[in-house]
UniProtKB/Swiss-Prot annotation:
It is an enzyme of class 1 (oxidoreductase). It is found in: Secreted. InterPro entries: Cellulose/chitin-bd_N, GlcNAc_Chitin_IntDeg, Ig_E-set. Keywords: Carbohydrate metabolism, Chitin degradation, Chitin-binding, Copper, Metal-binding, Oxidoreductase, Polysaccharide degradation, Secreted, Signal. It catalyses: [(1->4)-N-acetyl-beta-D-glucosaminyl]n+m + reduced acceptor + O2 = [(1->4)-N-acetyl-beta-D-glucosaminyl]m-1-(1->4)-2-(acetylamino)-2-deoxy-D-glucono-1,5-lactone + [(1->4)-N-acetyl-beta-D-glucosaminyl]n + acceptor + H2O. This is Lytic chitin monooxygenase. Its EC number is 1.14.99.53. Its cofactor is Cu(2+). Pathway: Glycan degradation; chitin degradation. PANTHER family: CHITIN-BINDING TYPE-4 DOMAIN-CONTAINING PROTEIN (PTHR34823:SF1), GLCNAC-BINDING PROTEIN A (PTHR34823). Cu cation binds at residues 29, 114. It comes from Enterococcus faecalis (strain ATCC 700802 / V583). Transmembrane segments: none annotated. Involved in chitin degradation. Catalyzes the oxidative cleavage of glycosidic bonds in both alpha- and beta-chitin via a copper-dependent mechanism, leading to oxidized chitooligosaccharides with a dominance of even-numbered products. Acts synergistically with the chitinase EfChi18A, and combining the two enzymes leads to rapid and complete depolymerization of crystalline chitin, especially with beta-chitin as a substrate. Is likely involved in a chitin degradation pathway that allows E.faecalis V583 to grow on chitin as a carbon source.
């Protein structure tokens, strides 16, 4: 009896100790806070301006998939289970941030820092259809910033340039390419260019 009780106590201690060492949701990764991404605006930190966003409600920082995961119709979720609601696409579905052409400051909040290969930014082309699923062929790459394989700060501020020929509703697609893994983090940002 004593041996069984000791086995149970040791097993329980091992489980609790292992759980304490396991990474938590708050420790994983990064999201675009300004201008806010779909995922960020679906979280309490973003004011829940977007609703029915799946896992993004609790973990906007966790849209992580292999680099160059540009799945037609699944750009916003990067095909990650639980984030599929972010892939819904209509002209009115998402909260939009008003911006202007020219320099645009982007702020990433990193809940876990990783060596960085690059920060890449895309924007929808003129004439894209906001009522069709997002497709990388309908985006132009507008910036690539070398991460120099360095570990960034927890708050990363960068400036990109929004082309002067863009007006109205567009989507900016931000990709944080990790330097020491095969993965990247993906964020769709809905903007109204004035």
């Amino acid at each position: 009896m004593k041996k069984s009780l000791l086995t149970i106590v040791l097993a329980f201690s091992f489980v609790l100790g292992g759980a304490a060492l396991a990474p938590t949701v708050s420790e994983a990764h990064g999201y675009v806070a300004s201008p806010g991404s779909r995922a960020f605006f679906g979280s309490s930190a973003g004011g829940n301006l977007n609703t029915n966003v799946g896992r993004a409600q609790w973990e906007p920082q966790s849209i992580e998939a292999p680099k160059n995961t540009f799945i037609t119709g699944k750009l916003a979720s990067a095909g990650v289970s639980g984030f599929e609601p972010l892939d819904e696409q209509t002209a009115t579905r998402w909260h939009k941030t008003n911006i202007t052409t020219g320099p645009l400051d982007i702020t990433w909040n990193l809940t876990a820092q990783h060596r960085t290969a690059s920060w890449d930014y895309y924007i929808t082309k003129n004439g894209w259809n906001p009522n069709q699923p997002l497709d990388i062929k309908n985006f132009d790459k507008i910036a690539s910033i070398d991460g120099k394989q360095e570990v960034p700060n927890k708050v990363v501020k960068q400036t990109i340039n929004i082309p002067t020929d863009r007006k109205g509703y567009h989507v900016i697609y931000a990709v944080w390419g990790i330097g020491d893994t095969v993965n990247a983090f993906y964020q769709a940002i809905d903007v109204n260019i004035q």
